[in-house]
Amino acid sequence: MEALHQKIREEGIVLSDQVLKVDAFLNHQIDPALMQLIGDEFARLFADAGVTKIVTIEASGIAPAVMTGLKLGVPVIFARKHQSLTLTENLLTASVYSFTKQTENTVAISPRHLNSSDRVLVIDDFLANGKASQALISIIKQAGATVAGLGIVIEKSFQGGRAELDSQGYRVESLARVKSLEGGVVSFIE
Protein backbone atom coordinates (compact mmCIF):
# COMPACT_ATOMS: atom_id res chain seq x y z
CA MET A 1 0.00 0.00 0.00
CA GLU A 2 1.89 3.00 -1.30
CA ALA A 3 0.32 5.61 1.02
CA LEU A 4 1.41 3.56 4.03
CA HIS A 5 4.92 3.00 2.61
CA GLN A 6 5.25 6.75 2.09
CA LYS A 7 4.05 7.52 5.63
CA ILE A 8 6.54 5.03 7.09
CA ARG A 9 9.38 6.54 5.05
CA GLU A 10 8.45 10.11 6.05
CA GLU A 11 7.42 9.69 9.69
CA GLY A 12 8.63 6.28 10.85
CA ILE A 13 11.73 6.21 13.03
CA VAL A 14 14.09 3.23 12.99
CA LEU A 15 15.20 2.71 16.61
CA SER A 16 17.25 -0.42 15.90
CA ASP A 17 17.57 -3.23 13.36
CA GLN A 18 14.50 -4.76 15.09
CA VAL A 19 12.29 -1.79 16.09
CA LEU A 20 10.34 0.67 13.93
CA LYS A 21 8.61 3.54 15.75
CA VAL A 22 5.38 4.72 14.09
CA ASP A 23 3.84 6.71 16.92
CA ALA A 24 3.38 9.76 14.67
CA PHE A 25 0.51 8.10 12.77
CA LEU A 26 -0.44 4.66 14.14
CA ASN A 27 0.22 3.77 17.74
CA HIS A 28 0.21 7.04 19.71
CA GLN A 29 -0.99 9.82 17.43
CA ILE A 30 -3.39 8.49 14.78
CA ASP A 31 -3.75 9.75 11.21
CA PRO A 32 -7.51 9.28 10.59
CA ALA A 33 -7.25 9.71 6.80
CA LEU A 34 -4.58 7.01 6.63
CA MET A 35 -6.65 4.75 8.92
CA GLN A 36 -9.59 5.17 6.55
CA LEU A 37 -7.42 4.10 3.60
CA ILE A 38 -6.16 1.14 5.63
CA GLY A 39 -9.72 0.13 6.53
CA ASP A 40 -10.78 0.42 2.90
CA GLU A 41 -7.88 -1.76 1.77
CA PHE A 42 -8.49 -4.49 4.36
CA ALA A 43 -12.21 -4.45 3.47
CA ARG A 44 -11.30 -4.88 -0.21
CA LEU A 45 -8.85 -7.69 0.51
CA PHE A 46 -11.27 -9.61 2.75
CA ALA A 47 -14.55 -8.80 0.95
CA ASP A 48 -14.90 -12.45 -0.09
CA ALA A 49 -14.03 -13.96 3.32
CA GLY A 50 -17.50 -13.87 4.90
CA VAL A 51 -16.25 -11.90 7.89
CA THR A 52 -18.82 -11.52 10.71
CA LYS A 53 -16.54 -10.03 13.40
CA ILE A 54 -13.16 -8.33 13.68
CA VAL A 55 -10.83 -8.97 16.63
CA THR A 56 -7.78 -6.95 17.66
CA ILE A 57 -5.75 -6.24 20.81
CA GLU A 58 -5.97 -2.94 22.63
CA ALA A 59 -4.77 -0.33 21.93
CA SER A 60 -2.88 0.14 18.65
CA GLY A 61 -4.98 -2.27 16.62
CA ILE A 62 -8.24 -0.52 17.45
CA ALA A 63 -8.06 2.33 14.90
CA PRO A 64 -7.41 0.16 11.81
CA ALA A 65 -9.85 -2.47 13.09
CA VAL A 66 -12.67 0.05 13.57
CA MET A 67 -12.15 1.54 10.11
CA THR A 68 -12.19 -1.96 8.60
CA GLY A 69 -15.30 -2.88 10.59
CA LEU A 70 -17.03 0.29 9.44
CA LYS A 71 -16.32 -0.54 5.79
CA LEU A 72 -17.30 -4.22 6.14
CA GLY A 73 -20.31 -3.42 8.32
CA VAL A 74 -19.29 -5.78 11.14
CA PRO A 75 -18.61 -5.34 14.88
CA VAL A 76 -15.09 -4.95 16.26
CA ILE A 77 -13.99 -6.66 19.47
CA PHE A 78 -10.74 -5.73 21.17
CA ALA A 79 -8.99 -8.12 23.52
CA ARG A 80 -8.34 -6.31 26.76
CA LYS A 81 -4.96 -6.35 28.45
CA HIS A 82 -6.21 -5.09 31.79
CA GLN A 83 -8.85 -6.47 34.11
CA SER A 84 -12.09 -4.57 34.40
CA LEU A 85 -14.94 -4.74 36.88
CA THR A 86 -17.30 -5.28 33.94
CA LEU A 87 -15.22 -7.98 32.21
CA THR A 88 -15.37 -10.96 34.56
CA GLU A 89 -17.53 -13.83 33.32
CA ASN A 90 -15.78 -17.00 32.04
CA LEU A 91 -13.41 -15.01 29.89
CA LEU A 92 -11.68 -16.33 26.80
CA THR A 93 -8.00 -15.65 27.54
CA ALA A 94 -4.53 -16.13 26.12
CA SER A 95 -1.06 -15.07 27.14
CA VAL A 96 0.91 -12.82 24.79
CA TYR A 97 4.49 -11.57 24.92
CA SER A 98 5.12 -8.06 23.61
CA PHE A 99 8.43 -7.77 21.75
CA THR A 100 8.56 -3.97 21.95
CA LYS A 101 7.42 -3.68 25.57
CA GLN A 102 9.29 -6.81 26.74
CA THR A 103 6.31 -7.84 28.87
CA GLU A 104 3.88 -10.74 29.09
CA ASN A 105 0.16 -9.94 29.24
CA THR A 106 -2.99 -11.98 29.51
CA VAL A 107 -5.54 -10.72 27.00
CA ALA A 108 -9.24 -11.41 27.37
CA ILE A 109 -12.50 -11.30 25.43
CA SER A 110 -15.97 -11.92 26.80
CA PRO A 111 -17.49 -15.11 25.36
CA ARG A 112 -20.74 -13.17 24.84
CA HIS A 113 -19.20 -11.52 21.78
CA LEU A 114 -17.86 -14.56 19.87
CA ASN A 115 -19.61 -17.77 18.94
CA SER A 116 -19.15 -20.82 16.74
CA SER A 117 -20.96 -19.25 13.77
CA ASP A 118 -18.52 -16.32 13.58
CA ARG A 119 -15.91 -15.89 10.85
CA VAL A 120 -13.33 -13.64 12.45
CA LEU A 121 -10.83 -11.31 10.83
CA VAL A 122 -7.83 -10.50 13.03
CA ILE A 123 -6.48 -6.96 12.54
CA ASP A 124 -3.25 -5.81 14.17
CA ASP A 125 -0.82 -2.93 13.84
CA PHE A 126 2.34 -5.07 13.66
CA LEU A 127 3.34 -8.64 12.91
CA ALA A 128 6.80 -9.46 14.26
CA ASN A 129 7.20 -12.81 15.99
CA GLY A 130 3.47 -13.54 15.72
CA LYS A 131 2.74 -13.85 19.44
CA ALA A 132 -0.17 -11.37 19.42
CA SER A 133 -1.73 -13.04 16.38
CA GLN A 134 -1.33 -16.49 17.95
CA ALA A 135 -3.00 -15.27 21.17
CA LEU A 136 -5.99 -13.91 19.24
CA ILE A 137 -6.23 -17.12 17.19
CA SER A 138 -6.28 -19.08 20.46
CA ILE A 139 -9.16 -16.96 21.80
CA ILE A 140 -11.09 -17.32 18.53
CA LYS A 141 -10.65 -21.11 18.66
CA GLN A 142 -11.75 -21.20 22.32
CA ALA A 143 -15.03 -19.62 21.17
CA GLY A 144 -15.39 -22.28 18.46
CA ALA A 145 -15.25 -19.57 15.80
CA THR A 146 -13.33 -19.66 12.51
CA VAL A 147 -10.33 -17.48 11.65
CA ALA A 148 -11.20 -15.85 8.30
CA GLY A 149 -7.75 -14.27 7.97
CA LEU A 150 -5.30 -11.81 9.42
CA GLY A 151 -4.89 -8.21 8.31
CA ILE A 152 -1.59 -6.68 9.36
CA VAL A 153 -0.78 -3.00 8.94
CA ILE A 154 3.03 -3.41 9.15
CA GLU A 155 4.77 -6.77 8.92
CA LYS A 156 8.41 -7.14 9.94
CA SER A 157 9.12 -9.93 7.46
CA PHE A 158 12.61 -10.52 8.83
CA GLN A 159 11.07 -11.92 12.02
CA GLY A 160 9.34 -15.30 12.12
CA GLY A 161 5.68 -14.43 12.64
CA ARG A 162 4.57 -14.57 9.00
CA ALA A 163 6.32 -17.88 8.32
CA GLU A 164 4.65 -19.45 11.38
CA LEU A 165 1.16 -18.25 10.38
CA ASP A 166 1.73 -19.35 6.77
CA SER A 167 2.82 -22.81 7.97
CA GLN A 168 -0.45 -23.10 9.92
CA GLY A 169 -2.44 -22.33 6.77
CA TYR A 170 -3.76 -18.90 7.72
CA ARG A 171 -4.42 -16.21 5.15
CA VAL A 172 -2.25 -13.20 6.00
CA GLU A 173 -2.58 -9.87 4.19
CA SER A 174 0.01 -7.24 5.18
CA LEU A 175 -0.22 -3.69 3.86
CA ALA A 176 3.48 -2.94 4.37
CA ARG A 177 6.04 -5.75 4.45
CA VAL A 178 9.31 -4.52 5.91
CA LYS A 179 12.28 -6.50 4.59
CA SER A 180 14.92 -4.80 6.74
CA LEU A 181 15.62 -1.95 9.14
CA GLU A 182 19.39 -2.31 8.84
CA GLY A 183 21.46 0.84 8.91
CA GLY A 184 18.46 2.88 10.04
CA VAL A 185 16.80 2.51 6.62
CA VAL A 186 13.38 0.93 6.04
CA SER A 187 13.33 -1.35 3.02
CA PHE A 188 10.12 -3.01 1.83
CA ILE A 189 9.23 -6.24 0.11
CA GLU A 190 7.42 -4.93 -2.97
Swiss-Prot record:
It is found in: Cytoplasm. It is an enzyme of class 2 (transferase). It comes from the Bacteria. Pathway: Purine metabolism; XMP biosynthesis via salvage pathway; XMP from xanthine: step 1/1. Converts the preformed base xanthine, a product of nucleic acid breakdown, to xanthosine 5'-monophosphate (XMP), so it can be reused for RNA or DNA synthesis. Homodimer. This is Xanthine phosphoribosyltransferase. It comes from Pseudomonas putida (strain ATCC 47054 / DSM 6125 / CFBP 8728 / NCIMB 11950 / KT2440). The lineage of its organism: Bacteria, Pseudomonadati, Pseudomonadota, Gammaproteobacteria, Pseudomonadales. The gene is xpt.
